[in-house]
């Protein structure tokens, strides 16, 4: 049993605590001993608190300095719209973008022919040894359209390729290569316009220069990809190999042994062999880069051949099995699981070929394909191809799944002959926004009957499959068009090059930029079939909220 003291402590615990505290007060020596024997926890706590507040003060001080004392770099103000005009000029079907002045906004490069340059630059055709008029290359700011550099580059230009890498340590990390007429071959610094090298070309005066300019792996060991120019003379295609860093010819001219057309594609098989693919009538022709290199240099090189491909190529005609209905018009690379596949577009149908076996993966039926397809994403993170099937008032836009060839969507979009190519931009929802040109009044043929050429630019997004947004309409002749992401997630715009349809009749040439989002509020909503419950303004709001992103 509990004694009297324990029982009282259990019944009255507070009194017991008071008694203990009074005992401690009455015995100070014992209390001091307890303090001396206790660990210095209170002093450690005070040190921790001081360190915490000191760290907090330092963090706040750094935030204050970064936010208010150190000035932030000025972000250039990007105009919503700008326009540059050249009188008595001719514009080329060439358009390229790159950040030339380092302001993190894409700038625009183009070519035009004129007697003199713009008022800001005094270099004339005569200064560069050309007769007037001659071809000028120009780079303008994507932010405001101001001229960054401009100079005469050739009497006339047959072929141009920009963003060609240069060797490490060179004065320019990237160059524009121009093949001129009658016999010039020049490289200019992409960022300043200054000449890197300039030579006379070795092409015959009767030779036609075929597109595009191909970049092949470095064979002369200078650290830059080398250049392959293909020409056609007397129904025979020949290859000319040049150093990418100096422009000097490597070896002699080499014949591919077959007739061909523009639209060449440099393809790498899954064994690492390089082949040149090109359309020849209704067949697909090919040539080994290894064999061409041995012809032009007389010696072996760093390239190799693929035995399977050599067995598919006819030794005499260099033709492969025809997979096309009608003339082959375009060859395009498509990303595959184990390398690139080849999309072969014919005038009456198209087919996706396996990149190694060249066997059809799928073959949808299409009646009349005359335009180059574009790629984009109809479903999230799933690559699709948009094909223009038919022309004029019968044109349809087909969206096909690149994995299966299944038709995802079909849009009836009548167009005018000779309309600009389509374009696409990736959006933040892992799809793409598509831009197509068509008739201003989709349900009327009066424009084609009266000859009133009025192109309208339509915007389409897969989340609204029964709606088109008419952004703008243009009555002048459009030479080139592209949709460009000038700043990541901020600034999507389209670029137009307009000018005379006849290159022999100079006239007004214009370079125009319009920001897409600023055109949406005044756009016209076009409903295809029965529209949904959303109002026109609600649809415009959805297009305005689209965010764009760079390609992965």
UniProtKB/Swiss-Prot annotation:
The chain crosses the membrane at residues 50-70. It is a single-pass type II membrane protein. Belongs to the FAM234 family. The modification Phosphoserine is found at residue 21. Its main location: membrane. It is found in: Membrane. Glycans are attached at residues 116, 314, 389, 473. Keywords: Glycoprotein, Membrane, Phosphoprotein, Signal-anchor, Transmembrane, Transmembrane helix. Residues 1-49 are cytoplasmic. Residues 1-40 are annotated as: Disordered. GO terms for cellular component: cell surface; extracellular exosome; membrane. InterPro entries: FAM234, FAM234A_B_beta-prop, Quinoprotein_ADH-like_sf. The gene is FAM234A. PANTHER family: PROTEIN FAM234A (PTHR21419:SF7), PTHR21419. This is Protein FAM234A. The keyword Repeat does not apply. It comes from Homo sapiens. Residues 71-552 are extracellular. Residues 1-22 have a biased composition (Basic and acidic residues).
